[in-house]
């Protein structure tokens, strides 16, 4: 989770760069925003949202992945106005998140994680 000055606590996300896959973007953005090296374990799903930039409406689709890391080191990206970051237990993270769609993604990710553990795949 990341805390920024505009939106409160949010999950990491970003824009696909030319030649990148969604998976590569996810790994890069987590590294850039938190300094964390992660591996993708599963695709969770996608969400849509819209916002205004000046007089223009912007529509975004975000693809979400369940990832794992060997470290709990986390350094927020100050240049992007993130001023806190961290790893939290599911229930703590759920209550910190600002947006309902991100809470749903977290819930879906937790369900998937528990299933992978149950199957011996985590």
Please name every model-derived segment.
Residues 1-12:
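N-terminal strand-loop-strand
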Residues 95-122:
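Charged phosphate-binding loop/patch that engages nucleotide di/tri-phosphates or the phosphate backbone
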